[in-house]
């Protein structure tokens, strides 16, 4: 918590906007939504304002989050349909949901394959938001990779293709994916990120995938379901 005291709360409306866009695209109106690794719970608050009939459930293992949850429940009209649970989702959860969210989650997990496989049976659909930390520039500089490991706890680094293959290898069928334009539009961009916006725009325009692999600056939003479901 000392390394990331804000828990990236300023990014929550932007991130939820990405989730809502993908759900609207597929005309999905989930009645039960669960977020694994829900952090402060802000994502669920914003999603609850979009899906006004949905029951909302959040799980996280960090005991420091309890005050945020109490604050959010007390100050928000969603308190009658919003619940938080402290502990491991796979140990505590007894429900199946219309939708599970994992927004910046499995890059923090020591064994992402087992974690993802164990989650398969708990929902019909899944939305993932995945940071794409791995690029030619980040490998050459090295510091960006060490920073996200030290400051926000990323244990695994992905390109677009590695992220999608990780999901496929864990039993998921990819229904849709898209870049989020994170380095060009997210609220918490650093000065260095803003300075890189011009070269990134140029390379993205020439060839999006190649530009991302070279200069980074992107995250991925993915809609998936269990294979064979």
What are these regions (language model features)?
Residues 1-95, 103, 113-116, 121, ...:
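Conserved N-terminal segment of class I S-adenosyl-L-methionine
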Residues 64, 92, 108, 133-136:
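Active-site loop signature of alpha/beta-hydrolase-fold enzymes
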Residues 108, 153-156:
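Histidine-centered active-site/metal-ligand motif
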Residues 125-127:
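Short glycine-centered segments of the SAM/dcSAM-binding site in methyltransferase folds
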Residues 129-154:
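Short, glycine-/aromatic-enriched active-site segment of Class I SAM-dependent methyltransferases
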């Amino acid at each position: 918590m000392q390394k990331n005291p804000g828990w990236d709360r300023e990014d929550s409306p932007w991130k939820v906007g990405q989730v809502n866009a993908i759900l609207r695209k597929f005309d999905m109106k989930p009645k039960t939504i669960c977020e694994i690794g829900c952090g402060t719970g802000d994502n669920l608050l914003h999603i609850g304002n979009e899906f006004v009939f949905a029951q909302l459930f959040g799980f996280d293992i960090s005991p420091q989050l309890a005050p945020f949850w109490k604050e959010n429940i007390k100050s928000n009209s969603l308190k009658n349909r919003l619940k938080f649970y402290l502990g491991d989702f796979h140990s505590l959860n007894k429900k199946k949901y219309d939708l599970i969210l994992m927004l910046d989650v499995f890059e923090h997990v020591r064994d992402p394959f087992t974690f993802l496989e164990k989650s398969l049976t708990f929902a019909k659909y899944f939305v993932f938001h995945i940071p794409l930390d791995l690029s030619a520039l980040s490998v050459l500089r090295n510091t960006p990779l060490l920073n996200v490991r030290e400051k926000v706890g990323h244990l695994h680094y992905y390109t677009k293709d590695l992220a999608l293959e990780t999901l496929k290898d864990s039993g998921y069928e990819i229904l849709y994916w898209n870049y989020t334009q994170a380095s060009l539009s997210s609220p918490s961009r650093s000065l260095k990120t803003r300075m890189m916006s011009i070269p990134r725009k140029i390379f993205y325009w020439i060839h999006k995938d190649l530009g991302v692999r070279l200069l980074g600056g992107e995250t991925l939003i993915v809609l998936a379901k269990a294979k064979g479901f």
